[in-house]
Amino acid sequence: MIKSELVQKIAEANPHLYQRDVENIVNAILDQIVDALAQGDRVELRGFGAFSVKQREARTGRNPRTGKQVDVSSKVVPYFKTGKEMRERLNGAA
């Protein structure tokens, strides 16, 4: 499912909302999550999961095309850990 499909499903489930309003809300939520992560904060949505960032250390990698070793610098990467309720629903317990 892509973002536009998510917006459409939410709009269909809530006929009192305009699709463009739903799109604005979804975009605002995602922007706030990204902004919080950019500041190094953790974003927890109880039952759904938690977004955080982790520091990936610098390492020596390999170019798969040439086989040549390359230095890969350290970077911050997003991380998502699923919540208990989501895991239970996905595994049919709920």
Curated annotation (Swiss-Prot):
Origin species: Azorhizobium caulinodans (strain ATCC 43989 / DSM 5975 / JCM 20966 / LMG 6465 / NBRC 14845 / NCIMB 13405 / ORS 571)
Keyword rRNA processing listed: no
Gene3D superfamilies per the UniProt record, alphabetical: IHF-like DNA-binding proteins
Known partners and oligomeric status: Heterodimer of an alpha and a beta chain.
Gene Ontology CC: one annotated term: chromosome
Role summary: This protein is one of the two subunits of integration host factor, a specific DNA-binding protein that functions in genetic recombination as well as in transcriptional and translational control.
Family: Belongs to the bacterial histone-like protein family.
GO molecular function: DNA binding; structural constituent of chromatin
SUPFAM superfamilies membership: IHF-like DNA-binding proteins
Name of the protein in its database record: Integration host factor subunit beta
InterPro entries with a match to the protein in the record: Hist_DNA-bd, Histone-like_DNA-bd_CS, IHF-like_DNA-bd_dom_sf, IHF_beta
One Pfam family this sequence matches: Bac_DNA_binding
Biological processes annotated in GO: DNA recombination; regulation of DNA-templated transcription; regulation of translation
Keyword DNA-binding attributed: yes
Alphabetic keyword roster: DNA recombination, DNA-binding, Transcription, Transcription regulation, Translation regulation
